[in-house]
Amino acid sequence: MQDHNRHVWDERVRKGLLHTRTARDDEFKNPLKAINGRGWITGSIKGKHVLCLAGGGGLQAPLYAAAGAHVTVVDISQEMIDQDKRIAQERGLELNALVGSMDDLSIIENASFDLVTQPVSTCYVPNILKVYDELSRVLRFW
């Protein structure tokens, strides 16, 4: 299943299809507003450690980085990760971009993140409980 999903997302990027667009110039003018349209994030995220889980593509991770967060993005698609790297380089942003599956975050240490963001994506894993087990391990709880 994961190999199939990886291939499909890589192809979607190559074709420029829906859900593969990168962040726009206007979104970088106020990156926190662009990523926080519903107002769920209160205050600044400057200096916070943010995991963009299955959030590759050059949209979310660069905007979080532009808002001052220390960002790691994990995505199953190399093409989506490459877009994050390209946008970060073009904008002079730092982010850690990793190819991996959201249900196996063994490449990440325990209690590494203050915030996790995840677009609709758990429908792509065979066992959602593994995802949430991994999230509970990598999140910091204050």
Predicted regions and their residues:
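A short SAM/SAH-binding and catalytic strip from SAM-dependent methyltransferases
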Residues: D114-L129
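A short, aliphatic-rich alpha-helical micro-motif
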Residues: S44-I45, E109-N110, Y132
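Conserved class I S-adenosyl-L-methionine
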Residues: M1-K46, L59-Q60
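A short acidic, Gly/Pro-enriched loop at the edge of an enzyme's catalytic core
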Residues: D103-V116
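A short glycine-rich, Lys/Arg-flanked "PGG" loop and its adjoining helix->strand segment in the class I
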Residues: L129-W142
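Class I SAM-dependent methyltransferase SAM/SAH-binding core
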Residues: K48-L105
